[in-house]
């Protein structure tokens, strides 16, 4: 059986985000159309499907690096802030966005909260492995 480790990250995230939007019906909160993904960004995302792309990326991170918490995810998705003439500094990503995505996965039972952070459940693992198998057959 094909796993997440056997397919490229870009293809997996693209296919998973499409599936989360169309089949799983992962809902984007109303406030998400107005927010930036972090303090280091100057504008909100241009891609209208950014919520599902970020969700797919977070799910892959939990699969590969779990258990992983919100703090570590904020660091992974953070970036350099442009401070004008002053030197740029690293800023962490938005915690609200990541917490909301993780809560959505918990309600779908794709992840489970532990003492050390979120881990992928067997249901979430089989979901991602199924998408990986579908990508590998193409």
Language-model regions, residue ranges each:
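Charge-enriched amphipathic alpha-helical scaffolds
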Residues: 54-57, 91-102, 106
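A short, conserved structural fragment
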Residues: 102-116
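Long, low-complexity, charged/polar intrinsically disordered regions in eukaryotic proteins
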Residues: 1-56, 60
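Short, amphipathic alpha-helical interaction segments positioned at domain boundaries
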Residues: 122-138
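Residue-level detection of the helix-turn-helix DNA-binding "recognition helix"
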Residues: 78, 103, 129, 133
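Short amphipathic alpha-helical elements of helix-turn-helix/winged-helix folds
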Residues: 58-65, 76
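Short acidic, hydrophobic short linear motifs in intrinsically disordered regions
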Residues: 67-89
């Amino acid at each position: 059986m094909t796993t997440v480790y056997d397919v490229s990250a870009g293809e997996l995230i693209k296919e998973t985000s499409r599936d989360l939007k169309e089949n799983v019906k992962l809902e984007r909160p109303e406030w998400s159309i107005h927010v930036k993904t972090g303090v280091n960004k100057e504008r909100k995302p241009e891609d209208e499907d950014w919520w599902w792309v970020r969700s797919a990326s977070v799910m892959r991170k939990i699969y590969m690096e779990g258990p992983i918490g919100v703090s570590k995810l904020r660091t992974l998705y953070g970036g350099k802030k442009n401070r004008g003439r002053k030197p740029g500094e690293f800023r962490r990503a938005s915690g609200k966005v990541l917490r909301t995505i993780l809560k959505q996965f918990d309600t779908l039972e794709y992840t489970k909260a532990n003492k050390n952070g979120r881990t992928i459940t067997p249901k979430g693992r089989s979901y991602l492995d199924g998408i990986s198998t579908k990508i590998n057959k193409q």
